[in-house]
Swiss-Prot record:
The lineage of its organism: Eukaryota, Metazoa, Chordata, Craniata, Vertebrata. Catalyzes the ferrous insertion into protoporphyrin IX and participates in the terminal step in the heme biosynthetic pathway. Inhibited by nitric oxide (NO). The 2Fe-2S cluster could act as a NO sensor. It is an enzyme of class 4 (lyase). Changing H386P: In EPP1; loss of activity. Changing I71K: In EPP1; enzyme totally inactive. This is Ferrochelatase, mitochondrial. Changing F417 to Y/W: Greatly reduced activity. It is linked to Protoporphyria, erythropoietic, 1: An autosomal recessive form of porphyria with onset usually before age 10 years. Porphyrias are inherited defects in the biosynthesis of heme, resulting in the accumulation and increased excretion of porphyrins or porphyrin precursors. They are classified as erythropoietic or hepatic, depending on whether the enzyme deficiency occurs in red blood cells or in the liver. The gene is FECH. Residues 1-54 form a transit peptide.
Length: 423
């Protein structure tokens, strides 16, 4: 039972659902790069971010012509309203790509029902729901507008959102794409760094859809399954880091320690050969190269739960350790997240940058703004799709290689599905 509890907690963390009760915050629509100075809280809310988010409402895409190319933007998603929380948890606990539980079909509904009230309260206190759909819609709108200019031969382009655990579900998005009569479909993960528990699960859902309905796709599928070192992605991260460094006192700026924080993984997953740690490290290395190694830095890992070994060092322990060693000016950079959600808005902004920082005696701590509505990020997405179309490749070479100790037979079927497509 101890192992079972650890698996359940790990699953919640992997889906970005915090088990702890968050403090009240203003809203998830506002990125809050908090700074503590001499133990006193000085909340610095980025006005530009707030303006972006206020205008980032999902809109129906105007279609003057029948879409020719569809881009399916894949993500786990998050409950958009409090009423979505139960179904979100239920689908999460039923996902065998994420975890395997005994009598899962019976245990999952029990766990979801038991957890729903507490999770609803958490989302209520950060604005009533997750911002992932809002930001994905805004990013998709910018992406397809640019794509129509970059690649007129494959236009019109239309983006579709495919979430694993909330509407619009991946399966619902595929059905809409089939109804639209697309010629080309691109499964585009919104996780820059590949993991079997995130991108892998979303790609498996596409394979399972066609396997269950018993028919072949009417459109030609390919996938952008990872993009950890894309030059515009790296530029976005570098720009946001430089922007936050400017807020530190001039005399302290060169001493600021940059902590790149990514969601951790259990070592049992890593030791099967999941490429996630290497790809996150590659992103960090490229960002620091772009910054010409302007400051000392470390890659740290957040959201560990349970007694089992996870990737380390942990973000909170790293903050404590740095303070104990006299390094009290810290910049947190969420390097594996492209938009704000509960792990940035609560875990980084409140738990670490307010509560923990005050306890440790941090002088200055800030968090780099997430990519959210940055126009350069939409340009990055468009460039990735455009380059993918021009390459005429079905997927990356890495996707053709299974983890050396993979235990999920569906992964092999999914790889076969994508590599057997004809463009």
């Amino acid at each position: 039972m101890r192992s079972l509890g650890a698996n359940m907690a790990a699953a919640l963390r992997a889906a970005g659902v915090l088990l702890r009760d968050p403090l009240a915050s203003s809203s998830w629509r506002v990125c809050q790069p908090w700074r503590w100075k001499s133990g006193a809280a000085a909340a610095a809310v980025t006005t530009e971010t707030a303006q972006h988010a206020q205008g980032a409402k999902p809109q129906v895409q105007p279609q003057k012509r029948k879409p020719k190319t569809g881009i399916l933007m894949l993500n786990m998603g998050g409950p958009e309203t409090l009423g979505d929380v139960h179904d979100f948890l239920l689908r999460l606990f039923l996902d065998r790509d994420l975890m395997t539980l005994p009598i899962q079909n019976k245990l999952a509904p029990f766990i979801a029902k038991r957890r729903t009230p507490k999770i609803q309260e958490q989302y209520r206190r950060i604005g009533g729901g997750s911002p992932i759909k809002i930001w994905t819609s805004k990013q998709g709108e910018g992406m397809v507008k640019l794509l129509d200019e970059l690649s007129p031969n494959t236009a019109p382009h239309k983006y579709y959102i495919g979430f694993r655990y909330v509407h619009p579900l991946t399966e619902e998005a595929i059905e809409e794409m089939e109804r639209d009569g697309l010629e080309r479909a691109i499964a585009f993960t919104q996780y820059p760094q590949y993991s079997c528990s995130t991108t892998g699960s979303s790609l498996n859902a596409i394979y399972r859809y066609y396997n269950q309905v018993g028919r072949k796709p009417t459109m030609k599928w390919s996938t952008i399954d990872r993009w950890p070192t894309h030059h515009l992605l790296i530029q976005c991260f570098a720009d946001h880091i430089l922007k936050e460094l400017d807020h530190f006192p001039l005399e302290k700026r060169s001493e600021v320690v940059i902590l790149f924080s990514a969601h951790s993984l259990p070592m049992s997953v890593v030791n099967r050969g999941d490429p996630y740690p290497q790809e996150v490290s590659a992103t960090v290395q490229k960002v620091m190269e772009r910054l010409e190694y302007c400051n000392p830095y470390r890659l740290v890992w957040q959201s560990k739960v349970g007694p089992m070994p996870w990737l380390g060092p942990q973000t909170d322990e790293s903050i404590k350790g740095l303070c104990e060693r006299g390094r009290k000016n810290i910049l947190l950079v969420p390097i594996a997240f492209t938009s704000d959600h509960i792990e940035t808005l609560y875990e980084l902004d409140i738990e670490y940058s307010q509560v923990l920082a005050k306890e440790c005696g941090v002088e200055n701590i800030r968090r780099a703004e997430s990519l959210n509505g940055n126009p350069l990020f939409s340009k990055a997405l468009a460039d990735l799709v455009h380059s993918h179309i021009q390459s005429n490749e079905l997927c990356s070479k890495q996707l053709t290689l299974s983890c050396p100790l993979c235990v999920n037979p569906v992964c092999r079927e999914t790889k076969s599905f994508f590599t057997s497509q004809q463009l």
